[in-house]
């Protein structure tokens, strides 16, 4: 009774004692784990301000003006020991480790793969993407990957001929804007959603077919096509914000978010119903390859089909559109690179009016060395997924970041987040020299750059390496070749700021578009 009265009277002392006990206990246990795992204290601790809320709100503010990824890049450079490339900080109350060290990234993605998971990603992304290959861990992910891997065989990704009808529509839009600057990024997003839906569903949404080039919009609208692209884009904005808020992700669950998800699901369900009403015999008889129909041979579960299709649609549309947009943006401000690329493409496939379109194939595109260098340099400066993260599934370590020189292992507590920045890694002067922030495709012919390994990760690495990377590279290569064959000059608007602001949701593209003039 006396003890209870003492606690009630001196409650503040009791709380302070409990807090101190918790802190001391945590400190002692952390030191024990560090000794057990032969780890050293992390060298760089970046001031996060008020439990990370300062940094969290900085990130939200930067996101609104296309500077979110540059904010993190700046944090790496402002650390006490920027060459170490690993620090610990907080965001919205949650402590996390940030790294651009290739050995740390290799550990998470490959050599210590089982020590790390996607953590809360399913909670962040499930309202739109459900349980698909990009949101699942463990056995669910293994099953998804086994199901999807055959759909990205060389025979499927090598079918470039299906792209030509979509390019012809893209070409009409470019010709329509002849002599003036226009945003080609918007057209690339429409091109890739058209080609991706044809690959996935057997029917294109034909978003490039509009009144401006002579098509009747009412005749080609189906399954909510007109609303789909806008809803898909808005849903990704919401998902990105949920991810930024970490443990507070549930705050982003507005009626508009739910409305957008419903539109996207209704759109995909239209195609899934068509696939499921077809008998197995009808699926086998289909003359051309259709991703969804092949998937329907493995499962008849409409939710599984929808979730996997939307996961692939996200990757198939957004990553390739972003790659094409950044490539054309840089080609437009580097006329010497454009001229050199035209020379290679002219030698391989001819230029209009003598273009040999029928010669363009998966195999020959891979032989265009300067084209590959241009694409690699674009992916280096502007990786489709500029930052990513993993959660520790158990108490473990990362190879670098600790000790007096930052080269000793660091402890990663179970449940702790590690964010890795491919964007910062691929602009590191340690690996790419003093001109690391410059667009210079010629660097890819230098032996030391070709041997960088884990310092170049445009498609991730390890067991979760992107299944569709050849699909994206082939599509981007084909479009660039056809642009070069069809048009002689490419110019970036002099009003376009450089470096460009970058819109980062689940993937990255240009915040202000790619204003170019093509003739």
Curated annotation (Swiss-Prot):
Molecular-function GO term, any one: oxidoreductase activity, acting on paired donors, with incorporation or reduction of molecular oxygen, reduced flavin or flavoprotein as one donor, and incorporation of one atom of oxygen
Cited function: Together with an NADPH cytochrome P450 the enzyme system catalyzes the terminal hydroxylation as the first step in the assimilation of alkanes and fatty acids.
Lineage of the organism: Eukaryota, Fungi, Dikarya, Ascomycota, Saccharomycotina
Gene: CYP52A11
Record carries keyword Heme: yes
Protein name, as recorded: Cytochrome P450 52A11
Record's note on what induces expression: By N-alkanes.
Class of this enzyme: oxidoreductase
Provenance organism: Candida maltosa
Stored SUPFAM superfamilies: Cytochrome P450 (SSF48264)
Residues annotated for heme binding in this entry: 466
